[in-house]
Amino acid sequence: DTDRSRGLGDVYKRQIYKSSMKLLYAKNFSVDYYEGGYKILTTKDGTQILTVPKGRKTPKDIDKDIIVLKEPVSDLYLVASGVMDMFDKLDAVDTIKFSGLDSDGWYIDSARKALESGRMLYAGKYSKPDYELLVSENCSLAIENTMITHSPQVTEKLKSFDIPSIIEYSSYEEEPLGRVEWVKFFGALTDRDEKADELFNKQVDIVNRIAKTDGTDTDDATKSDTVAFFYITSNGQVQVRKSTDYVPKMISLAGGKYIFDASNDDDTGRSTMNMQLEDFYNGAIDADYLIYNSAIDGGVKNLNELLDKCPVLADFRAVKDGNVFCTTNDMYQQSMSIGYMIDDMHSMITGAPDSGMKYLFKLK
């Protein structure tokens, strides 16, 4: 396999390729396993990491673009905040020494406590890292999210200090479970491959269970309850998800139907879009359920707060029927909980009490 041997020098000559990680949904990374415990992790943009097992030598004449990390991997700089939950569930938070959020920005206890105790250090946000700190404390790798593509000079500067970086592309995954499957990438990176499989399979099981209990007649589209997922921007527009985004797919897996279809989508590359209030009104007034997304503005505590933000919502069917929900503030940091979120949506649609929900609550 010529592609697999590309640039690997002696790894390929001396190390025998064994197998590749089986991926069910994720499309934006791969992991190859070699004899002797060596691994090659590759992301969507072609960046490669070679992990070298403890006590083993780094192969000679390896391509200079390949990032080499010796196990046990440590001193990571985690800028991609959505991934901390994966490290937390993998029991791998101790591999992270630097954070792109300070303690008050985290809903994840282990991260917040590590920063409060000084074991983890705040090293600045993605666009303004504390280079001096990262260099003096021997940062091994920066894990960025796709925002870094807007600040290429940061990646260049990190590189000039011999700090390699990778971008995690879980947000590019169209399937909700494809996002969760990135836990296997970080499981491979931190040598917790089996644990990662376990965590991923647990979320898959939840989704499969919902599909079974749902008994949804997928052919009969008219049966599905419709759901709008939105938030009100500071200038009074309504931000919604495009029909191709992962949130509409979660709604569908939960047995519902997203209220907007492809005919409403704009043609930007983004997963969200802003609508004029009038268009949202016309499109969602008859939605069976409304979910207010709290991730941007901290959300609302009750129905009156929501109606203060947007009085015309009082005309909406979901408001009249008492079917308005809000996401909890920590939802966007809980990347390993997509299965639970789908479960909550399913509970909402089937009329189960909201007391059992983890990431949604009813606005009263």
Stretches found by the model and what they are:
Residues 10-84, 195-229, 352-364:
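Bacterial Sec-exported substrate-binding components of ABC uptake systems
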Residues 70, 77, 124-129, 145-152, ...:
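Soluble non-cytosolic domains of exported or imported proteins
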Residues 42-135, 141-148:
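A short, structured surface patch at a secondary-structure boundary
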Residues 75-78, 96-99, 141-145, 165-168, ...:
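Structural recognition of the beta-strand scaffold that forms the well-ordered cores
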Residues 1-12:
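Single conserved hydrophobic/aromatic residue that forms the stacking wall/gate
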Residues 210-301:
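Flexible, glycine-rich surface segments
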Residues 74, 82-87, 92, 99-110, ...:
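Extracytoplasmic ligand-binding site segments that recognize negatively charged/polar headgroups
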Residues 173-202, 211, 215, 286-364:
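Structured C-terminal subdomain patch of bacterial secreted/periplasmic proteins
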